[in-house]
Every structure is written in C-alpha cells, then in structure tokens.
C-alpha cells in the first residue's frame, strides 16, 4: 500500500462528501438504536461508481476525543489517494466490487446479536419478515476458515447464492453487503440485528420456524420480488 495525496476530480470529491455525510448519519442511528454498543466497530466501504476507487468510513469509536468521520479514499490496488489511514477494507473487498458491479457497499460491523450468532459457527436462517421481504437470500453463512480472506469467501458464497446479504465473521461480527448505497445498507444492518435478537429469543422457546410459503409470497409481494421468486420455484 502506498499513500499518494492527489487532487480527486470533482465528481469523486462530491461523492466522498455525500458518503461521509451518510456515514455520519448511519453511525448516529446505529448507536441510538442500540444496534451497536460498547466499542462500536463499524467499517463502511462505499465504491465510487464507474471507478476502481472506494471510500473507507470508520466509526471513530467511544475513546476518540475527536468523533469527526475522516474518509480514506483508496484504489482497489491499495493506493491511498486521500486521507490518513489504511486501505485494508478497500483492498479486502476489491475483488467483490470488481466481479459484482451491482454491489455498492460492504460494512464490517460488530453488534450484540449478530455477534452472538457469529460465536456459534452456525448457518443463520433468515426468518424475520422485515429482513426476508428485502431479499431472496435465505441464509447467512459463517466464515470460519480465516486463511481465506473475507472477500474471497464472499465471492465463493455469491456463486452459490447470488442474493447473499451477509456473512458472519466467526467469533467476531458480520460483513453485510449492500446494493443500494450506504444508507440503505445501514437500514439493513438495523433489521438484521433485530432479526438476530428475535431468533435468539425464539431459541429459548423451542426455536424459530421457517416461513410458510404463503408468508413468503406476501413478504416478497410487498417489495416486488414475488415474480422472480416464482420463476426460481421459491414460492
């Protein structure tokens, strides 16, 4: 990785300003809703459309005297173009961005209930209606073998599940995938954390139960996914 302070073109600069503003809002909401607590690890990476550049936006954390969000702009090759910090998360997801132009954003997040499920090394079935209606994906897999990078693991899982929305970082948190920008990704994280909590509570009551197909039809019908679900034989 090298650091090369250059003048970014106006479109990239404007994108970085907007992404930083969105990240500030997301960090505030994720804290206020209790989605993250304690150390509050949240690392967004937002690709700059039409380029091989991404913006890394990290929550400063509770110990920071200055809570200002400082973006790091880096190329997929690891060169830092603007800001002080590592391009690690950018390079970690670069293969994913290159192979899947529909993916706009990835966030690495530690939250209590998603983190709890990450401790189990179990595949997490999506059984919360507010999450399921947003995706045709039905599960969140655990990334256990850390000799394989997160980006490579995500790529492999996308070949099995093209609608994948997240993976668990075994014994850590989750990497959540966005296809509609940073704020929509942050909203998904809030819902995933809610669902993880509800399903954990259900574990104490005998376990959560999968959707009836009629319920899946209702949920996907609300978000325009029902026709594709029928084409795939999911309902």
Regions flagged by a language model, labelled:
Residues 1-235:
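Glycine-rich flexible loops
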């Amino acid at each position: 990785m090298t650091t090369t302070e250059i003048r970014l073109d106006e479109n990239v600069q404007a994108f970085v300003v907007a992404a930083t503003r969105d990240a500030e809002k997301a960090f505030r909401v994720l804290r206020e809703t209790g989605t993250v607590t304690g150390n509050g690890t949240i690392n967004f990476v937002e690709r700059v459309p039409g380029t091989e550049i991404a913006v890394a936006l990290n929550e400063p954390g509770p110990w920071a005297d200055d809570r200002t969000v400082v973006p790091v702009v880096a190329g997929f090759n690891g060169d830092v173009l603007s800001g002080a910090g590592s391009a690690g998360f950018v390079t970690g997801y670069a293969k994913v961005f290159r192979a899947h132009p529909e993916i706009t954003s990835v966030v690495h997040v530690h939250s209590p209930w998603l983190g709890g499920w990450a401790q189990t090394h179990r595949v997490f079935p999506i059984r919360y209606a507010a999450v399921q209606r947003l995706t045709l994906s039905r599960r969140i897999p655990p990334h256990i073998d850390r000799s394989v990078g997160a980006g490579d693991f995500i790529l492999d899982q996308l070949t099995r599940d093209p609608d994948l929305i997240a993976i668990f970082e075994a014994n850590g948190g989750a990497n959540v995938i966005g296809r509609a920008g940073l704020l929509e990704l942050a909203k998904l994280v809030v819902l995933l954390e809610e669902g993880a909590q509800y399903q954990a509570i259900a574990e104490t009551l005998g376990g959560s139960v999968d959707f009836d197909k009629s319920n899946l039809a209702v949920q996907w019908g609300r978000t325009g996914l029902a026709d594709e679900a029928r084409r795939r034989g999911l309902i």
